[in-house]
Amino acid sequence: MPTLRILALLAVTALSASAAEVKYQLAPNFLGTPPGKATIGNGHGEIAVDSAGLIYVSVQEKDAGIQVYGQDGKYLKTLALPMSLHGFVIRKSTDGEFLYGAVLNEQRFIKAKLDGTVVMEIKPDAFPADKGTAKDKAGKSVNALKLTSCDVAPNGDIYIVDGYGKSWVFVFGADGQFKSVFGGPTQVVDGKGFANTHKVFVDTRFSPARLLCLDRGNNRMFHVDLDGSNARMIANKGLRNPSSASFHGDLMCVAEIAGRISVWDKEGKMVASLGVNDTKGQTSTPKVAPADWREGVVTSPHGITFDKDGNILETEWNIFGRVLRWNRK
């Protein structure tokens, strides 16, 4: 009996320690603005942190699609990248550290150095013709791709999702050559095809790595193997339309566009909820004005990232542009 009591106490202690590890505190007014601007500008994209701790935020500005900030939140510079980097990640490999991005309005993929130099491109005609074309009202073939997100697997394969189109997930080699496609409306997971699979991320918390699919049209998120098989549901109830995610240690943070940031453990249990907004008309919209923003309360979370210390940064779908930060306690 004493042994059982000791084990029980250890279990409670472990649970308490685990809970303490996922507490966060808002860092008010963390991010600055570019010179002469009251806000960062029209946001409908993503946020990421490089290995040096610099913060990259995409905005809807022509030839100035990425703003770079220091670890202290102060504006540093703008990169001359496309204005519609709806989804991007920063990944480090043996050949360096690069930004990988899905250019929504141009339906192409880019790989760029962190100074903004584009070193590789996957153009629209590299995608399978039967997945990337449609007929307009006049019967003319048009490009139907609507690329929203991308990520890179440990072996260098590139995953690109057609999240505003048919939700196909395209796989390209590190050299930019097409390899395969899965997902879309014809691949059924728990009775439903992929729908508005807004963003996908390679989840290296698992071995082998898996692909996280934020299937926003069905208000759910699930894993598949990197070949698209073996779907595993993470959550399909109680979500607020998951739009982006990031990983740190065993944790995953999720930006939910209907007004919430959630944090999940590796077993798929939600362990924290941040910035919840239940005010009608203030979520799933880009039009909430700065006068209506409330400290620590989100509007329409669209992009999210952990930094190297496990702090959370979130960027919103907002025509004025907004970034919030929560520090890990």
Model-predicted segments: where are they?
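Beta-strand-rich domains and repeat architectures in extracellular enzymes and scaffolds
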Residues: P28-A64, T148, F320-G321
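Blade-loop segments of beta-propeller domains
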Residues: P34, D63-L104
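Beta-rich, blade/repeat-based domains predominating
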Residues: K37-S51, P82-Y100, F127-D157, Q187-R210, ...
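Short loop/turn segments immediately following the C-termini of beta-strands
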Residues: Q60-E61, L104-E106, G163-Y164, R205, ...
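Loop/turn-rich, solvent-exposed surfaces of beta-rich toroidal or solenoidal domains
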Residues: P208-L214, K237-T279, P286
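Blade-level signature of beta-propeller repeat domains, shared across WD40, Kelch, NHL, RCC1
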Residues: V297-K329
